[in-house]
A protein has these predicted regions:
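Bacterial Sec signal peptide processing site at the extreme N-terminus
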Residues: 17-34
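Outer-membrane beta-barrel "beta-signal"
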Residues: 19-21, 231, 274, 382-384, ...
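C-terminal outer-membrane beta-barrel translocator/porin domains of Gram-negative envelope proteins
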Residues: 26, 213-222, 226-351
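Short loop/turn motifs that connect adjacent beta-strands in outer-membrane beta-barrel proteins
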Residues: 34-43, 69-77, 102-104, 130-136, ...
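Gram-negative/organellar outer-membrane beta-barrel architecture
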Residues: 38-40, 44, 52-219, 225, ...
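Residues that define the transmembrane beta-barrel architecture of outer-membrane proteins
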Residues: 42-44, 56-60, 89-93, 117-121, ...
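Membrane-embedded beta-strand positions in outer-membrane beta-barrel channels/transporters
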Residues: 45, 61-63, 78, 94, ...
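Membrane-embedded beta-strand positions of outer-membrane beta-barrel proteins
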Residues: 46-48, 79-83, 109-111, 137-141, ...
Length: 413
C-alpha cells in the first residue's frame, strides 16, 4: 500500500506538513551525502492512509513521511514508515525509502510484513554513471507474497463467475545492462529469475485456484521456476526518463526461457512497444499514447509467464492479471492536463488531471484477433508531481466488471 501512501503524502503537503532544519551529522549516509547542505531541510508529513484496489479491497492506517531536500532544494531522499490494516491481511508494518543522490543514480527499498499471508521485500537500483554515462545498470531484488491474486481462466471472454483466489509467493531478481549507441539508441541485455509458489489465498468467499482448475488445465498452478535471458533494442527521443513531456520511444524485446537453465518450461517472449508525448501550451497539455504487442510461444508455459492484461499499467478498468493468453495487443491514450502549480511549506507540487482510454485484448494468436474481444476502458486520472522524482496518481477505470480504482507511483507509461 506504499503507492497509496505516496499520493496521500503529496496531498498532505497542503494540510499537515511541517519543515525543520536538521544538522547533516544527524542524518548519516545514505540519508544524506555531499549534495545536501548543512543544515538539511526536512519536511515531515504525518497523515492517515486510506487505499482501495480491485483485488485487495480497502486498507486503512497511518504513516509519517520524511522528505529530505538537497542544496538545490530538490527532494533527494524520502522515508515513509507506515502501519495499516486490511481485513484480508491483518496488520501490516512497513518502511519505504527512495534515494536520488544523482540524476543518473537512484535506489529504492521497501520492507513490509503483514500478520497474514502478505510480505513485500524489494530493493531496486538504477545507475548510469559508468562509461561517461553510456552504460546503464538496473538491479531489482524481490521477495513478495500477495494473498489477493486472482485467476479467471484463459482467453478474452473469461466470465467473472470463474474467479479464483491464491497467494502468489514470488522470489527472484531482474538484472539488465544497457549501452548507449549514439544519442538516441540503446541495446540492453537482461537476466531474470523467479521462483513462484502458489498457496491458499487470503480473500474469504472466493474459491482457491486448485479447487477449480488442474495443472493440466493451468500450467504452473503448483508452482514454477522461470530463468530467462533477454535482448532489447531501444530508440528514444524523450526529454526525461520519469516524467517526459516531449518525444518518442520504441522498444523491441526478445526473451528466451529454457529448461536447461533451470526454467520449468521452454518458451519465448516477443514484445514491441511504442509511445509518444506531444506537448501544447508550454507542456500544460501533454497528449500521451502507447501501443504494445506481446506474444508468448511455447508449450506448457506457466500461467503467470504468459501474456497478461489488467491492472494499473495496462487495462485500468480491471484488476491485475484479469486476462491471460498467448498474446495481447494494447493501446493507451491519455491527455495530461496541468491544473495548477502550488508551493506550500517550500515544496512545489504540480497537479494534473488525465482523462484516458485503454483498449486491448488477449488472444490465442494474432491471426485470431477479433474486434468483439477488445476491452474498452475509459477513465480519469489525478496526478500530483513533486519534481523531479515524485509522482503520485489515482486512476479510476471502467470495465465490464465495474469500476476499478488504482493508486500508485509514477505514470502508467
Amino acid at each position: 500500500m506504499r503507492c497509496a501512501s505516496y499520493l496521500l503524502l503529496v496531498s498532505a503537503l497542503f494540510l499537515s506538513a511541517c519543515t525543520s532544519m536538521v544538522p547533516r551529522k544527524d542524518l548519516p549516509s545514505p540519508l544524506t551525502d555531499k549534495s545536501f547542505g548543512d543544515p538539511v531541510k526536512v519536511v515531515t508529513v504525518p497523515l492517515p492512509v486510506i487505499a482501495s484496489s480491485p483485488n485487495e479491497g480497502i486498507t486503512s492506517g497511518a504513516l509519517t513521511a520524511f522528505l529530505l531536500h538537497n542544496d538545490k532544494d530538490e527532494v533527494s531522499t524520502l522515508l515513509a514508515p507506515q502501519i495499516n490494516y486490511n481485513q484480508n491481511f491483518g496488520v501490516t508494518t512497513s518502511i519505504y525509502g527512495a534515494f536520488y543522490p544523482l540524476p543518473s543514480r537512484s535506489w529504492e527499498l521497501n520492507l513490509a510484513q503483514a500478520t497474514r499471508k502478505n510480505f513485500d521485500y524489494e530493493f531496486k537500483i538504477r545507475d548510469k554513471t559508468f562509461k561517461e554515462g553510456k552504460l546503464e545498470l538496473n538491479v531489482f531484488l524481490s521477495a513478495i507474497a500477495d494473498g489477493s491474486s486472482r485467476f479467471f481462466g484463459f482467453q478474452a471472454r473469461t466470465p467473472r463467475q470463474q474467479e479464483t483466489n491464491y497467494t502468489d509467493q514470488d522470489i527472484g531478481f531482474n538484472l539488465s545492462v544497457g549501452y548507449d549507441i549514439g544519442r538516441h539508441y540503446q541495446v540492453i541485455f537482461g537476466e531474470r529469475y523467479r521462483d513462484v509458489g502458489i498457496h491458499m489465498g487470503a480473500v474469504r468467499g472466493i474459491p482457491f485456484i486448485r479447487d477449480r482448475f488442474s495443472e493440466a488445465q493451468v500450467p504452473g498452478i503448483n508452482g514454477f521456476t522461470a530463468h530467462a535471458q533477454r535482448l532489447s533494442f531501444v530508440y528514444s527521443t524523450l526529454n526525461a526518463k520519469d516524467a517526459p513531456t516531449f518525444g518518442g520511444y520504441a522498444r523491441a524485446t526478445v526473451e528466451n526461457s529454457a529448461k536447461v537453465l533451470g526454467s520449468s518450461a521452454d518458451y519465448r517472449h516477443y514484445e514491441i512497444e511504442m509511445k509518444g508525448f506531444i506537448p501544447f501550451d508550454d507542456a500544460r497539455y501533454v497528449t500521451a499514447f502507447r501501443g504494445v504487442y506481446n506474444q508468448t510461444l511455447g508449450n506448457s508455459v506457466p500461467f503467470l509467464e504468459q501474456s497478461i492484461l489488467g491492472g494499473e499499467n495496462t487495462l485500468r478498468g480491471y484488476g491485475r492479471n484479469r486476462f491471460i493468453d498467448n498474446c495481447y495487443v494494447l493501446l493507451n491514450l491519455e491527455e495530461r492536463i496541468r491544473l495548477f502549480r502550488w508551493e506550500v511549506f517550500n515544496v512545489t507540487a504540480d497537479w494534473e488531471v488525465a482523462p484516458f482510454i485503454d483498449l486491448g485484448s488477449v488472444m490465442r494468436s494474432f491471426g485470431s484477433a477479433a474486434s468483439r474481444d477488445l476491452e474498452f476502458n475509459p477513465g480519469l486520472g489525478v496526478r500530483a508531481l513533486v519534481r523531479p522524482n515524485i509522482i503520485g496518481r489515482v486512476d479510476v477505470g471502467f470495465g465490464k466488471d465495474g469500476p476499478a480504482v488504482f493508486v500508485g507511483l509514477g505514470y502508467p507509461f
